[in-house]
Amino acid sequence: TYDAKYGAKMSGYNSSESKTYPNEDWFITPALDLTGKSAATLIFNHAFGPAASVPNTDATKAQYTIWVSNDFDKDVKEATWTELKGMVYGTTGWGYVSSGDIAIPAENLKANCRIAWKYVCNDVSATWEIKEVIVK
């Protein structure tokens, strides 16, 4: 969902039931036209919460990933996605950090470029908040 205070927010937590449900969420940008660009970088601010859900192992970091595609239409399972590596992870609950500069591969520098944040929630309450997204 989008919230002016938080930006994009993905979570498996249902506050009315005080329960977390395992799920897979995708937050996908509108189509970007990167035709003619020789390079492009993604930067954003993000936070994880609560503190117990901050990714600090390879297994927990695998729950929070970034992807790029040029053939996404309506179904994430039918698109060809390439994982973007190099994201900086925060170390405290709800502490916003910069993702760092994440390079978009040259083969994706064309029309219909979509960037996606994929969050795989287990049965532990956790939220990923993303804001101030820039592609330059």
Residue ranges and their predicted role:
Residues 20-26, 120-136:
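Extracellular carbohydrate recognition
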Residues 1-17:
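Extracellular glycan-recognition surfaces and repeat-rich motifs
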Residues 45-86:
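Extracellular ligand-binding interfaces
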Residues 22, 35-37, 95-97, 108-110, ...:
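Surface-exposed coil/turn segments at beta-strand junctions on protein surfaces, enriched
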Residues 2, 35, 59-60, 107-111:
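Extracellular/periplasmic catalytic domains that process cell-envelope and extracellular macromolecules
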Residues 74-108:
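Extracellular carbohydrate recognition and processing domains
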Residues 29, 34-52, 64, 68, ...:
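Extracellular beta-strand-rich recognition modules
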